[in-house]
Amino acid sequence: MVDTDPNSDLRESSVSRRRFMAAAGATGAAMGIAGCTGGDDDDGTTTIQLSADADFEAIEDEIEAALYDAGLSEDIELEVLPGDFETDSRREDYQAALDANRGDPDIFMMDSGWTIPFILREQVLNLEEQLSDDVLSRIENEYLEASVDTATHPETGELFGVPFFPDYPVMQYRKDLVEEAGYDPEGENWATEPMSWEEWAEMVADVWDYHGGEDEYTYGFTTQAAAYEGLACCTFNETMSSFGGAFFGGRENLFERGDRPVTVTEEPVIETIRMMRAFMYGDEDEEAHPDFPQITNDDLVQYTEEDAREPFTNGNAIFHRNWPYSVVINGEEDAFGEDLGTMPLPYGVSPGDSQYDGLGGTQHALGGWHLTVNPNSQNLDAAIEVVEAFVDDDVMLTVFELNGNLPPVPEVVEAADPDELGPIGRYLDTLAVAGEHTIPRPVTDVWPQQAAQVYQEVHDAYTQEKTPEEAMEDLQEQLETSDQD
């Protein structure tokens, strides 16, 4: 609701702070990777530089304390260099640093979607001979297998990164507004039982209309639909998968290229685009899916994560798709507190109705980040000690509580006391469902190129530059070519 929310000033403050940190991250990445040097200090301590999200700079002291409690030598200090908030830009920064054989930062926080190309180029340290047997065994046996797969060499199976946290989104909503409109989220088990996209959209439209529609709330729903990696890997991938569609004919073809079908012109993929066009343009768009109402507008085609979060946090949207970090922000008492609800993402078709195994039903993009070690570091032993300390349960829980980043070991969350986790503890049931229904991106050495092809063509369809069929026919040709290069 515009300018009438009593908490708007508080929320604006939160947004401004995070925006400042993100902007600082872009500058900090360039400065840190290009010139800041760690190493041995005059007092005998060794400073290990970790390039990570800007958020981690704000909680650096708490993380360092947890690392010491986990056994990290107190002669080692951690310095967080805030990386660019946009994953594509961060990849380019890391590529430049490693191409130049720079020794800093010592540790990179790398997106699981583009770690493998760095592994194949032998630009990050092979950890098989560096980590202790106990740590290697834990990663192999207890960590999420899908996360570990994106941190290992696809041919040799050797480990080159330690999963820092997996990421999978949830649907957030204003529970107070939904209940005022006559719905019963708790009685209907919204937190754990997914709706169909059609049922969900009709409900969103009804709640939005009940509260005055666009005159009172700019959006019924916000998500990420800008032309960037997040559209290809995540919002489009998960929605397409929930309709039973796929880039390359199913899950078995995600990680090996060259001899797999390209299937983006199939009907479930087209239906996904038509639904999104209905959400943004309504029945004024002749390509919009007739079974879905308008619940937002085309501002979405400019939105990445923070762009989509801000209207929701500021009280101008009712539903919002995003990663767990934003649940922490929106669940704070100076935001929505217990008026924030979460639910699994809706589904397009039931699992049994997809021609591909494991598709259909609720699907959540599997994101996440790994810790990789710079092989040019002058402090390799200390860097390895830091990475090993991050494998500790209490370190994982500290990061989870303070920043909403999920532990890579499911049992750590299951054993945690929700009351000790802050706002995120209220939403573990939804996160558990999301974690059981994830879809990875098709990560191969050519995925960075293919991701750009995907998000540009999907974006052209979302912005009405092309029909869904035209965009997917063009994408089909591009993916077939790049898969053979």
Regions from the language model: what does each represent?
Residues 2-16, 21-123, 133-141, 398, ...:
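Conserved N-terminal structural module of periplasmic/extracytoplasmic solute-binding proteins
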Residues 51, 154, 405-412, 425-480:
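C-terminal capping/gating helix-and-loop segments adjacent to ligand/active sites or protein-protein/ligand interfaces
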Residues 59-60, 214, 387-410:
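Periplasmic-binding protein-like
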Residues 59-68, 234-235, 270-378:
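Extracytoplasmic/periplasmic substrate-binding proteins
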Residues 98-110, 122-125, 217, 314-322, ...:
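Alpha-to-beta junction loops
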Residues 113-170, 232, 353-356, 420:
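Hinge/lid segment of periplasmic solute-binding proteins
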Residues 128-143, 188-193, 245-271, 333-334, ...:
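Short, solvent-exposed loop/beta-turn-alpha elements that line the ligand-binding surface or hinge
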Residues 149, 153-237, 245-292, 375-381, ...:
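Helix-loop-helix "hinge/cap" segment bordering the ligand-binding cleft or interdomain interface
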